[in-house]
């Protein structure tokens, strides 16, 4: 008999099961592969708006006066974003042999949040620690992967949906691709990141795990007029691959 192995569940796991999702193991996390046909999910997203549980993405929080210079050391000074901006970057190991891709959000002059892939967060965390060991100054690293839930909105009506629930100015001029801001979403303190998925308009909303179900339900209710549908990892990867 094969011994069971640990499996991580997001705060929205039971919501997915209630919607009839087919679950799949994704780097040790149970995630919805699909709710129905991935092709139908993609069509619905491209015509309206879709919701995807992206809570398992790696989330490394860096705080301290030297956090920006540390990021510059791991990647390059030119890839350190300004406050309120996000930037795709590669975190290089201290020996420059390898690296991990991540999306770095500059939340303050001394505060960064780096998102990584599900399967690379441990490597990214170790890479940060290696650089911290040889850099003078104050930097604090916290792995928030399991502490923060995250929902991705994708589709032409994602801005309309999110605007119903937040006072943040999401206009294209003020909130272009790779912009980030903290504020209230559905009366919950959250981080909003615009990170377009391929050619599709997309936002990522990060909040405390304890508010995940409330946020998911509120987004689905507010999105009914736009035909909002949940979509799984198959559709997510296909959308991301479509440039």
Q: Could you describe each region identified by the protein language model?
A:
Residues 1-243:
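Basic, glycine/lysine-rich polyanion-binding surfaces/domains
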């Amino acid at each position: 008999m094969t011994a069971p192995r640990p499996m991580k569940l997001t705060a929205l796991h039971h919501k997915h099961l209630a919607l009839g999702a087919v679950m799949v193991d994704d780097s040790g996390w149970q995630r919805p592969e699909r709710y129905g046909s991935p092709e139908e999910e993609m069509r619905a997203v491209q015509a309206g708006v879709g919701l995807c549980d992206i809570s398992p993405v790696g989330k490394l929080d860096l705080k301290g006066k030297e956090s920006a210079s540390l990021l510059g050391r791991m990647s390059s000074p030119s890839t350190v974003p300004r406050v309120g901006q996000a930037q795709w970057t590669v975190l290089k190991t201290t020996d420059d042999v390898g690296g991990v891709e991540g999306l770095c959000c500059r939340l303050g002059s001394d505060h960064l949040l780096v998102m990584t892939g599900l399967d690379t967060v441990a490597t990214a965390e170790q890479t940060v620690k290696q650089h911290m060991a040889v850099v003078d100054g104050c930097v604090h690293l916290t792995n928030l992967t399991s502490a923060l839930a995250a929902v991705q909105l994708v589709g032409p009506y994602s801005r309309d949906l999110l605007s119903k629930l937040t006072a943040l100015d999401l206009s294209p001029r003020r909130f272009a691709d790779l912009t980030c801001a903290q504020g209230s979403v559905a009366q919950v303190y959250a981080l909003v990141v615009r990170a377009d998925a391929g050619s599709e308009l997309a936002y990522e909303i990060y909040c405390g795990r304890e508010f995940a179900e409330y946020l998911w339900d509120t987004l689905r209710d507010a999105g009914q007029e736009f035909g909002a549908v949940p979509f799984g990892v198959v559709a997510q990867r296909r959308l991301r691959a479509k440039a």
